[in-house]
Amino acid sequence: MFAFRNRAVTQTLLVRRYSTKRIPQNLTEKIVQRYAVGLPEGKQVQSGDYVSIRPSHCMTHDNSWPVATKFKGLGAKAVKDNRQVVMTLDHDVQNKSEKNLEKYANIENFAGEQGIDFYPAGRGIGHQVMVEEGYAFPYNLTVASDSHSNMYGGIGCLGTPIVRTDAASVWATGQTWWQIPPVARVELKGQLPAGVFGKDVIIALCGIFNNDEVLNHAIEFVGDGVEHLSVDERLTIANMTTEWGALTGLFPVDETLRQWYEYRLTRLPQPHARVNDGTVAALKDAVQADTDAKYAKNLTIDLSTLSPFLSGPNSVKVYNSLADLSAQDIKINKAYLVSCTNSRLSDIEAAANVIKNNKVAEGVEFYVAAASSFVQKDAEASGAWQTLINAGAKPLPAGCGPCIGLGTGLLEDGEVGISATNRNFKGRMGSKDALAYLASPEVVAASAVLGKIGFPEEVYGSPVPGAKGVSSSISVTEAVEAEADAEAAESDPAPSGGVLDGFPAQITGELVLCDADNINTDGIYPGKYTYQDDVPREKMAEVCMENYDPDFGSKTGAGDIIVSGFNFGTGSSREQAATCILARDMQLVIAGSFGNIFSRNSINNALLTLEIPALINKLRKRYEGQPAELTRRTGWFATWDVPAATVTVTDGKNGPVILKQKVGELGQNLQEIIVKGGLEGWVKAQL
């Protein structure tokens, strides 16, 4: 059982009756409400709340075997609901080594033993399969142990990533937990000009709003521009909300989507378990955000002002107009039409229309892989696939391949590549000494023919369009709502569902400021210890934060509360970044925001976290102009009143109040995970 050291533990269960007053909800909150379990009667979920969820489906891919190993290590024998779990093999499908084939066989055998739906190598990329086969479906909440689960939002399904421990929990118990993120409303206005596509939209959004405006947010796309986007374009945009920093990218269910599903009915064998007359007919009963729903931010972009864009090189936050790059005569070595982002039928046909009656330029390698075997079959039937092959494109099996840096055709030292994929991080698609750009399928195909980054119009011999000035805006309501939350905190002392035995009603400690943004997991727990499994707890405590500040250990003590800047815990998935803080007898970290994987690893290991941007801003203002210190004892104390869902900051332990603010509710289901020492302990208790 988890012990809060140096804390008094409340043994009484505090319970609150929820008000019957309607709380306006956005679409994200409404979907989560459907899939949240164990809520107190009358509880309406809101952004910031920690909730237990029972997702409609959970997908794992090549990482299914590590999840299975963790699942077995928990003592689980049988999957709780084998209709909830889906397994696909898609990442390393070109790898025919004995080791990889053995792993694939183990996954298939496990799926067979458990009666789990399994899709072998060659069937397609897992996210595409999830959409095609209806595991991701409008108004569902579907998770996957992969960062591009956001893609499901393109069909009105709330898709979000989880880590392997979460997946093992879903297998064993049918559920895991989620903190409902702040929700950003992104309004798409107008209609895209000819020659501009969904990929250009998300490249523009990533490039224009590139200061973490939507980091760890849920996104809801709205506006009259949505109806002009095809479903394939919506899937592309939702897919790359991951690179934009968001945890979901949700489009509305509208007539365009309903007609798309009507067509899907004719393509799938009927009766189909998930996409059938009944489920499609039910989409006419629209679920919409309340008109007075709250959003953390409102962003707007006018689609009519966009032109073709590229991301890069080597960053999705750097964007340039095609007009500018085309004029620079940037030679390319490789081009890629692959991945779950842009390898659907419309993408392949668009590329084929550009490349028909032409050849891939000498010295250029053009790789193509369909997002699924279904897509490839349709592309072959339409003639688009053969058009690409006749032009000199090199086919790859349906799967992730070069997008994830696996298999044939990777970028080599000094090469330049242009790709219709979602990530161009340095070294991701091959050599760290290569340059990678992201673009739409049309621009990728044109560049493959031209041998340089260029327009389709250059292939056609038509005039090249110029760049436009993009019209966009952002309004941030965080500061206003923070003040409103503070006022509400004064008047609403008990919004929580209660406190379990063994969980403290209050957590208090002195704030120790680590004043930096983007403190990564290597700064928290040095990489040289990550794969040493025998590091004792005392040593973990000693090296905690040493890469960030070697003096951290001498300046901090048990019971302190770390307070830091934005995107705390970014970087790798190492769980020790959370457990080393616990080893120092610190049970709470407050930050402006957290890296998503760190947040999940924290709760999964019983470390509590709170996002309070207003506190960070107050502390930074307090020390403005003073000599910088990596680690600073502030003399301010924070008290988290768990049943009241408020944090009060005072100058001194019993001094004047500096800040009082509402925070997300930590429901009893989540408290139980903490009391059990983390998610694995909780799962074991359920078996």
From Swiss-Prot:
GO molecular function: 4 iron, 4 sulfur cluster binding; homoaconitate hydratase activity; metal ion binding
Catalytic activity, as annotated: (2R,3S)-homoisocitrate = cis-homoaconitate + H2O
Record text on cofactor binding: Binds 1 [4Fe-4S] cluster per subunit.
GO biological process entries: lysine biosynthetic process via aminoadipic acid
Protein name: Homoaconitase, mitochondrial
Cofactor: [4Fe-4S] cluster
Family that this chain belongs to: Belongs to the aconitase/IPM isomerase family.
PANTHER family the record matches: HOMOACONITASE, MITOCHONDRIAL (PTHR43822:SF2), HOMOACONITASE, MITOCHONDRIAL-RELATED (PTHR43822)
Keyword Transit peptide belongs to the record: yes
Subcellular location(s) per record: Mitochondrion
Signal peptide boundaries: none
Residues engaged in binding [4Fe-4S] cluster: 340, 400, 403
Principal EC category: lyase
Residue ranges of the region described as Disordered: 481-500
Gene Ontology CC terms, in alphabetical order: mitochondrial matrix
Organism of derivation: Yarrowia lipolytica (strain CLIB 122 / E 150)
Known function: Catalyzes the reversible hydration of cis-homoaconitate to (2R,3S)-homoisocitrate, a step in the alpha-aminoadipate pathway for lysine biosynthesis.
PROSITE patterns named in the record: ACONITASE_1 (PS00450), ACONITASE_2 (PS01244)
Subcellular location, principal: mitochondrion
Keywords: Amino-acid biosynthesis, Iron, Iron-sulfur, Lyase, Lysine biosynthesis, Metal-binding, Mitochondrion, Transit peptide
